[in-house]
């Protein structure tokens, strides 16, 4: 169990640019320039993790594979890679970047047998992204329903999934605060570590998530709040270190 909350600043890549979306919806992006520059800036600011997402791969609108590999390769810190990892080819490409772990999303919902095999083969290098609206999972860039959250959790627990990245889609990119109840419920349903994603808007939000560390929350992905300059990464790291 984590002793303090890990923070994972996010770099989401769409069409070669670092962007942020609202509710994860295509067409709502705000561009923030070079993904490599953004990633290096978070590293310089003291990040121990980077959450790196290929949005084109997630939405099925192409990919930024070469750029993602370049960014991951330039990092001296740990990298969690996400977006469109749903078969042997995309998984091999993701792992070849040297990232610390990969997040499976849609694939986990559409090809459960493959996910079970990958978890068995790669263990701690695999996390499963649980993108939730209510208690329903959403797949493929959040445009399709993918089953019940708790039934899926039960299955993945039994298959030995090492960790979960939990996103409340209703909160993501909105700066409206995290869904603490969802995080508590997921922690109650699994003994694996949970990484929170979506809605962080303030240092108080991060402190509230940090208070869930004893329940099993290990980390928090922070995106729009950092880019919108609601607080600095240094301030965030200090807030959760206490």
UniProtKB/Swiss-Prot annotation:
Pathway: Amino-acid biosynthesis; L-histidine biosynthesis; L-histidine from 5-phospho-alpha-D-ribose 1-diphosphate: step 4/9; Amino-acid biosynthesis; L-tryptophan biosynthesis; L-tryptophan from chorismate: step 3/5. It catalyses: 1-(5-phospho-beta-D-ribosyl)-5-[(5-phospho-beta-D-ribosylamino)methylideneamino]imidazole-4-carboxamide = 5-[(5-phospho-1-deoxy-D-ribulos-1-ylimino)methylamino]-1-(5-phospho-beta-D-ribosyl)imidazole-4-carboxamide; N-(5-phospho-beta-D-ribosyl)anthranilate = 1-(2-carboxyphenylamino)-1-deoxy-D-ribulose 5-phosphate. Its EC number is 5.3.1.16, 5.3.1.24. The active site is at 12 (proton acceptor), 131 (proton donor). The keyword Amino-acid biosynthesis applies. GO terms for molecular function: 1-(5-phosphoribosyl)-5-[(5-phosphoribosylamino)methylideneamino]imidazole-4-carboxamide isomerase activity; phosphoribosylanthranilate isomerase activity. Its main location: cytoplasm. The keyword tRNA processing does not apply. InterPro entries: Aldolase_TIM, His_biosynth, HisA/PriA_Actinobacteria, Isoase_HisA-like, Isoase_HisA-like_bact, RibuloseP-bd_barrel. It holds the Pfam family His_biosynth. One of its GO terms (cellular component) is cytoplasm. Transmembrane segments: none annotated. SUPFAM superfamilies: Ribulose-phoshate binding barrel (SSF51366). GO terms for biological process: L-histidine biosynthetic process; L-tryptophan biosynthetic process. Keywords: Amino-acid biosynthesis, Aromatic amino acid biosynthesis, Cytoplasm, Histidine biosynthesis, Isomerase, Tryptophan biosynthesis. Belongs to the HisA/HisF family. This is Phosphoribosyl isomerase A. It comes from Streptomyces avermitilis (strain ATCC 31267 / DSM 46492 / JCM 5070 / NBRC 14893 / NCIMB 12804 / NRRL 8165 / MA-4680).
